[in-house]
């Protein structure tokens, strides 16, 4: 990851509108990870990541910033809700499962990368196995005709050509494939580690078992290709890479951290609040967790926590946890202008998504600037009058706005083949204006 903070912010701007302070903070945190890896080994161990606390209302881009950041970094990433965890000793998930899930995400990520890397070799091997099934080897007999091998080779090349052109896709063959170890165990909360161990045990017991199956060539080719790719992937090497990636580049996003903060001066013991915070402390500070990859040290994993803090304040978190989240970033509520930009500027914006979806049925729609502006105003008004859910309000409004068009897209396509349906201010008002004005209706429908 050699992108500069400026380049990271530029890339985030393609997907997220506004929130420049938050983008700068995460860009610097990500760049510092690269800087740390350039240091001498003895100094590198001492440099720990500066964890981030994002504060802001729902739907302003907190989660999206973290998600896009992980894609940019090509690093193991996991998003969890703080409310899902309980204090150790109580029924529920313990916080160490966060690191176990991060390890699983890393294994999946690296396995997918390795499968892509060996794809061509796997395809060649799969092709040979399918051809072997289509053309069984002739038994050796007394006839030692020298022309036979050449004839076999010509036949094989002919079948190879037909296979690649898809002419044999529907032909049924019998082929030997690995038997899937189909053991799925569901466990009560808090017993995930034992479940993983049992699943690994049963999977190893079934390893190596093979059986003959009758399949169509197209299905068999995919199955055999995946099997050959798995065989070409070195599991030990993959685990070593995944372990290093988790420890040195892992990113954990903890959402709804405000829900485990003690609200004001409320008394009493609350299992789901202060206890969870105290369990998170060693994880964020640095400890060792047992996972599928072995022992994972959390010292250099970057933690990004976020919360709306409507009913509580960051100062309501236990002091030790506040100290472990030194970088504070406040995300601003969205304005009508922000909504307008969200609808039109980002890569794969909402209006572009709906336009392309309807185009698949031959129906063209066009969002005019005045229509987008009016839609943004209504979204802001409804958020102000009812519950402020940020940019998520746009999904609700667009679904309502285009409900009739989506339902009758096939019929409308022939009627509007020459020119598109134009979504202007009048169209938006006719479909949403009355609902937006009526507070009771907008509370339930929008």
UniProtKB/Swiss-Prot annotation:
In the record, the note on similarity to other proteins reads: Belongs to the ClpX chaperone family. HslU subfamily.
Q: Which Pfam families match?
A: AAA, AAA_2
Q: How does it assemble?
A: A double ring-shaped homohexamer of HslV is capped on each side by a ring-shaped HslU homohexamer. The assembly of the HslU/HslV complex is dependent on binding of ATP.
**GO cellular component terms attached to this protein's record:** HslUV protease complex
Biological-process GO terms, alphabetical: protein unfolding; proteolysis involved in protein catabolic process
Provide the binding site for ATP. Answer: 17, 59-64, 255, 320, 392
Q: What is this protein called?
A: ATP-dependent protease ATPase subunit HslU
Q: Which GO terms describe its molecular function?
A: ATP binding; ATP hydrolysis activity; peptidase activity; proteasome-activating activity
Q: Where in the cell is it found?
A: Cytoplasm
């Amino acid at each position: 990851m050699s992108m500069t903070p400026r380049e990271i912010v530029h890339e985030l701007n393609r997907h997220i509108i506004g929130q420049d302070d938050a983008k700068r903070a995460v860009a610097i945190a990500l760049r510092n990870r690269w800087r740390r890896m350039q240091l001498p080994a003895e100094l590198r161990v001492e440099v720990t990541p500066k964890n981030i606390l994002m504060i802001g209302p729902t739907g302003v881009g907190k989660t999206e910033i973290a998600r896009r950041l992980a894609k940019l970094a090509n690093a193991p990433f996991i998003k969890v809700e703080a409310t899902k965890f309980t204090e150790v000793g109580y029924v529920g998930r313990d916080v160490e499962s966060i690191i176990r899930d991060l390890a699983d995400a890393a294994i999946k990520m690296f396995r997918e990368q390795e499968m892509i890397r060996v794809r061509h070799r796997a395809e060649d091997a799969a092709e040979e196995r399918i051809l072997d099934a289509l053309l069984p080897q002739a038994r050796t007999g007394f006839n030692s005709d020298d022309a036979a091998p050449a004839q076999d080779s010509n036949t094989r090349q002919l079948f190879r050509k037909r296979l690649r052109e898809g002419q044999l896709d529907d032909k049924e063959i019998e082929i030997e494939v690995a038997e899937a170890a189909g053991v799925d165990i569901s466990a009560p909360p808090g017993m995930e580690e034992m479940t993983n161990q049992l699943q690994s045990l049963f999977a190893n017991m079934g390893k190596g078992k093979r059986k003959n199956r009758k399949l169509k060539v197209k299905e068999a080719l995919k199955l055999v290709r995946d099997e050959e790719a798995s065989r070409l992937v070195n599991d030990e090497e993959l685990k070593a890479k995944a372990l290093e990636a988790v420890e040195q580049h892992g990113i954990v996003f903890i959402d709804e951290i405000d829900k485990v903060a003690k609200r004001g001066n409320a008394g009493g013991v609350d299992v789901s609040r202060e206890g969870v915070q105290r369990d998170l402390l060693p994880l964020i500070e640095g400890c060792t967790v047992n996972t599928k990859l072995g022992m994972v040290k959390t010292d250099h994993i970057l933690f990004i926590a976020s919360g709306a803090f409507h009913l509580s304040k960051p100062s309501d978190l236990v002091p030790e946890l506040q100290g472990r989240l030194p970088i504070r970033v406040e995300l601003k509520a969205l304005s009508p202008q922000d909504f307008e930009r969200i609808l039109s500027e980002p890569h794969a914006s909402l209006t572009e998504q709906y336009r392309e979806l309807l185009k698949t049925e031959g129906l063209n729609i066009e969002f005019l600037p005045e229509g987008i502006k009016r839609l943004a105003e209504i979204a802001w008004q409804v958020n102000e009058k009812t519950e402020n859910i940020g940019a998520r309000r746009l999904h609700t409004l667009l679904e309502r706005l285009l409900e009739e068009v989506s339902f009758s897209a096939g019929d409308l396509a022939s009627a509007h083949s020459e020119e598109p349906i134009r979504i202007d201010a009048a169209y938006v008002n006719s479909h949403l204006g009355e609902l937006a004005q009526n507070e009771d209706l907008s509370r339930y429908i929008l």
